[in-house]
Amino acid sequence: MTNIRKTHPLMKIINDAFIDLPTPSNISSWWNFGSLLGLCLIVQILTGLFLAMHYTPDTMTAFSSVTHICRDVNYGWVIRYLHANGASMFFICLYAHMGRGLYYGSHAFRETWNIGVILLFTVMATAFVGYVLPWGQMSFWGATVITNLLSAIPYIGTTLVEWIWGGFSVDKATLTRFFAFHFILPFIIMALAIVHLIFLHETGSNNPTGIPSDMDKIPFHPYYTIKDILGALLLILTLLMLTLFAPDLLGDPDNYTPANPLSTPAHIKPEWYFLFAYAILRSIPNKLGGVLALLLSILVLALIPMLHTSKQRSMMFRPFSQFLFWVLVADLLTLTWIGGQPVEHPYVIVGQLASILYFLLILVLMPVTSLIENKLMKW
């Protein structure tokens, strides 16, 4: 008799995706982040569901309802901080996952990569609307500043902003619709993640060498299930340490002040995971130019498959490209730091140089270096 997991229509799908999936035997721990992102998404949906049971999306009561969750709901403070810090863990895993994809040439899987870029946009949108919900000072002013950027669009800009706001300023209508978006988007992310996996399993996973490994595949279970469990335990440990020992480490103290349209915070800045994009936005003195640069800083990822000029897929055997990759990582860390600093000398010029370097690396230096490496390899 054939095993039920190989015959039952539903079990067969799970079996082909997580049990009997042929996997390269040499993938490193950098390949753990996909499953960790799945875990983060589950944690966020569960904690978010319990928060939604007690939260009220109304300007008069939103801030109080979050306080009520922390003070009066059984373990409400744990759920709230797991959700807030879970978002940070989500982005850490996301950026590591993308960095691994860039380094090892995973963008050769065009469909998988493009769905990944769409996923990144969706996750960023979810995090943005979610940050508005506690209705603190930074929530309110962050929403005002970022939505206002759309007014830079010629002709329809102002109308578009007022349409998103549901009025002439960020108010009750804005908060209500942002809550609705924040509730629906994670399920859209889940659907996209499944599509991401479907496309990945069409080709099979890449591996550190970038060389096809069809002749050397091993079953996903038990080898990689156990490896993923180790990663999951480390992720949960880090999240719990953050939540229980330093819950406000990555947050902004301004968000403990209720939203006040009459008082602007000294420094309006997003959560740490958006600071690199915020720094690029601020580095251009023109509003429309800044908005375009902000969009392009993420959209440029969709161009990476077309900018891949090397004859080798992975950077494993390409030392010059490796160097530029780590320069890019350092540049993004610099931009993240600059995004959190006030707009004054020398931060402005450093931010502008880091922004130029970011686009220069991806669009010019890395493709040209790959061509030079091709020549050095006497191909």
UniProtKB/Swiss-Prot annotation:
Cofactor(s), names only, from the UniProt record: heme b
Subunit structure as annotated in this protein's UniProt entry: The cytochrome bc1 complex contains 11 subunits: 3 respiratory subunits (MT-CYB, CYC1 and UQCRFS1), 2 core proteins (UQCRC1 and UQCRC2) and 6 low-molecular weight proteins (UQCRH/QCR6, UQCRB/QCR7, UQCRQ/QCR8, UQCR10/QCR9, UQCR11/QCR10 and a cleavage product of UQCRFS1). This cytochrome bc1 complex then forms a dimer.
Residues the record lists as binding heme b b566: H97, H196
Name recorded for this polypeptide: Cytochrome b
Comment on bound cofactor: Binds 2 heme b groups non-covalently.
Binding sites annotated in the UniProt record for heme b b562: H83, H182
Function of the molecule: Component of the ubiquinol-cytochrome c reductase complex (complex III or cytochrome b-c1 complex) that is part of the mitochondrial respiratory chain. The b-c1 complex mediates electron transfer from ubiquinol to cytochrome c. Contributes to the generation of a proton gradient across the mitochondrial membrane that is then used for ATP synthesis.
Transmembrane segments: 33-53, 77-98, 113-133, 178-198, 226-246, 288-308, 320-340, 347-367
Membrane topology: Multi-pass membrane protein
Sites where the protein binds a ubiquinone: H201
UniProt-listed PROSITE patterns: CYTB_CTER, CYTB_NTER
PANTHER family: CYTOCHROME B
Lineage: Eukaryota, Metazoa, Chordata, Craniata, Vertebrata
Keywords of the record: Electron transport, Heme, Iron, Membrane, Metal-binding, Mitochondrion, Mitochondrion inner membrane, Respiratory chain, Transmembrane, Transmembrane helix, Transport, Ubiquinone
GO biological process, one term: mitochondrial electron transport, ubiquinol to cytochrome c
GO molecular function term, any single one: ubiquinol-cytochrome-c reductase activity
Family: Belongs to the cytochrome b family.
Domain of life: Eukaryota
Extra remark: Heme 1 (or BL or b562) is low-potential and absorbs at about 562 nm, and heme 2 (or BH or b566) is high-potential and absorbs at about 566 nm.
